[in-house]
Amino acid sequence: RILGEVVGGVRDYGNRMGIPTIDGGVWFDDRYIGNPLVYVGCVGVMPRDLIEGDARPGDRIIAMGGRTGRDGIHGATFSSAELTDTHADEFSHAVQIGNAITEKVTLDAVLAARDHPDGCLFSSITDCGAGGFSSAVGEMGEKIGAAVRLDRAPLKYEGLSPVEVWISEAQERMVLAVPAENVEAIAAICDRHDVEWCDLGEFGTPDRELVLHWGDVEVGRIAMEFMHDGVPMPLREAVWDPEWAAREAGGDDVGVESMRAIGDVAGVFDMTATLLGHPNLASKAWIVRQYDHEVQGGSVVKPFVGPNAGPGDAAVIRPVPDRPRGLAIGHGLATGLARDPYVMGLAAIDECVRNMVCVGADPDRIAILDNFCWPGCDDPRNLGSLVRAAEACLDGGLA
């Protein structure tokens, strides 16, 4: 059921957002039965002159998109927590309730504001990911401060406290810094795309503070300098212990399991069927064929290639329809290859680069998208293994 829900979520959201799902991998391991790990990498293309932008004093804090609810509160905290029986109640609201259609029309409105005939209508923009409005406004107003009216945020239902509105990670929302003279044009675009929006306040305060109001009541005030730089960077000990890592490593090993099964099966054909029946070796076509890899019409090299539609490990899209340039996307997965995360990290990068070269990518122009999901790093040995993986990414990227 968990696998089916994950596949269904990727299928439905990607299609409705208009984002082709053209590459990926699946691996099964007993250690992830109750808590699956899903990585998502997404590549965006934008005008080079709009890559950087900062909120300016006097800019309005404009939120557009979905309404705010309790879903998603402490979502980032939950995803990093050690799961126990007590977390079911504590984090019951942590999972965000997504709405792909709302996010798609919000995306369309943002693009219309960016490509407006009079020029880009906003100074800066960010999403409401981990931390919701708190991280979005806190990051954008780091250098100049911000005054926020939380009671103006559209809510999914009544009864939310100022804290809940401030930290909810409910998706489908974007925060823009908009010059006051452009707010009317932003409103017209939102009305045209049927996107809800609100004015949450203003960037820029005299003392570079973050000030929060709920109606006539001030519910928060903190200096931006303290919020961003007031907590010293912690120093942690990292130790690489290969013997401990070998003992801790468990889970499924396709080779060992298959050899055990082969001992009980007579005949090479049955042996082959046993190997191919393992979920890590069996065809994933039933998953891949559910995904929309054609949306936008820019897919050139697709998930299944060749006369017999064999599976590929890299793909090519044409991101700008009127330009004859391709963008290759590939991946590498080296689970179980070794007990050393450095070796596995290098192997994954090596596999990914080879896959991309096979579809025509220039090795000198390959960029690595890496991410880390790791056991609690309060244990120096866990942190040591994380350092090993990071070193592999560095060495592999520079090789």
Regions found by a protein language model. Give the residues of each.
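Glycine/proline-enriched, intrinsically flexible loops and inter-domain linkers
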Residues: R1-A399
